[in-house]
Curated annotation (Swiss-Prot):
Source domain of life: Bacteria
Originating species: Idiomarina loihiensis (strain ATCC BAA-735 / DSM 15497 / L2-TR)
Gene from which this protein is expressed: lpxK
Known function: Transfers the gamma-phosphate of ATP to the 4'-position of a tetraacyldisaccharide 1-phosphate intermediate (termed DS-1-P) to form tetraacyldisaccharide 1,4'-bis-phosphate (lipid IVA).
The keyword Lipid biosynthesis is annotated on this UniProt entry: yes
Binding site for ATP: 58-65
GO biological process terms, semicolon-separated: lipid A biosynthetic process; lipopolysaccharide core region biosynthetic process
Name of this protein: Tetraacyldisaccharide 4'-kinase
Catalytic reaction equation(s): a lipid A disaccharide + ATP = a lipid IVA + ADP + H(+)
Family according to the record: Belongs to the LpxK family.
Length: 329
């Protein structure tokens, strides 16, 4: 957590300066790898249907999952049959694997399970995205567009459209590549992208801004929708890429927090994690709720979040998809 906080400060922390040689090695390796794919020296899989990659150039939360959910739901409304592929971080395997709504987060991964339940779309997970795309084609021949969650740097899978998410609040941090900074690829990558989309405000590189808004509240133990009594005091936990955003959102909604506790992204929650938080009702994200349902109390609640796609973005994206579908790939 300390390291991530330092990454998103404007100046390079003196201790992080010691990591800059490793960042240069990271830059060399990733650029060579990308060049090999671009030159055809490493094989790439081309799916029979258009592939939309939703990714980012930095680590940490940039709103990819809400974007994938919103994109999938909108495409279904437009008559498309989207399928989602993802890495399945934390999933047990074997891979590739098609996620079922009845799966546990331990089996399928927290984010793929959330996307499966929220969208109703088929979801296939595999560390190698090309394998996931192949299984999707085999199991779901009616799928006519594949949405690849967090696959920007997975060049073994050819893509037709890239949607790069950027957090307008934190931007590109100190501008350094891993491990001295938060970047998987340099800011130059944004200039060559089809679509750069910011959330939580405008960013200089972004063509479109997506509003991410808090949704409804539900009980963690049974998913029953509730009206939260905001006059109470609450404790909050978050095991996501940027926990402070969740806590800030609660405060902006007029919710009084007595305690807030951050955990690492994809944290595997246990009942012991809440031993010091039992004095008040507990609030958490939808992503974390799935991992706490088996031991949740009746006064534990989670909130959904909704990404609102701009109309001009929908129009342009639909036109581009139709063009790709008609053979311009």
């Amino acid at each position: 957590m300390w390291l991530q906080k330092q990454w998103y400060k404007a100046r390079l922390h003196p201790l992080l300066f010691l990591l800059t040689p490793l960042s240069l090695v990271f830059w060399l390796v990733t650029n060579l790898r990308r060049s090999f794919y671009a030159l055809g020296l490493m094989p790439r899989y081309k799916a029979d249907v258009p592939v939309i990659v939703v990714g980012n150039i930095s680590v940490g939360g940039t709103g990819k999952t809400p974007m994938v959910v919103a994109l999938s739901q909108w495409l279904k409304d437009e008559g498309w049959n989207p399928g989602i592929i993802s890495r399945g971080y934390g999933a047990k395997g074997p891979f590739p694997y098609e996620v079922l709504e009845s799966d546990s987060p331990e089996k399928a991964g927290d984010e793929p399970l959330l996307m499966r339940r929220r969208t109703g779309c088929p979801v296939v997970i595999a560390p190698k995205r090309a394998q996931a795309a192949k299984l999707m084609a085999e199991q779901h021949p009616k799928v006519d567009v594949i949405i690849c969650d967090d696959g920007l740097q997975h060049y073994a899978l050819k893509r037709d459209i890239e949607l790069i998410m950027i957090d307008a609040e934190r931007g590109t941090g100190n501008g350094w590549l891993l491990p001295a900074g938060p970047l998987r690829e340099g800011p130059w990558r944004l200039k060559g992208a089809d679509w750069v989309i910011s959330n939580y405000g405008r960013h200089a590189f972004a063509r479109h801004v997506v509003d991410v808004e808090p949704g409804n509240w539900y009980r963690v133990d049974n998913n029953e929708q509730v009206a939260l009594k905001t006059e109470s005091k609450f404790n909050a936990v978050a095991g996501i890429g940027y926990p402070q955003r969740f806590f800030n959102s609660l405060i902006e909604q007029g919710i009084e927090l007595e305690n807030s506790q951050s955990f690492a992204d994809h944290h595997a929650f246990s009942q012991q994690d809440f031993s010091n938080l039992a004095s008040n009702p507990i609030l958490m994200t939808e992503k974390d709720a799935g991992k706490c349902q088996s031991f949740a109390q009746a006064d534990w609640y989670y909130q959904t979040i909704e990404a609102k796609l701009p109309e001009v973005m929908k129009t342009n994206l639909l036109a581009e998809l139709e063009r790709k579908k008609n053979g311009h790939r």
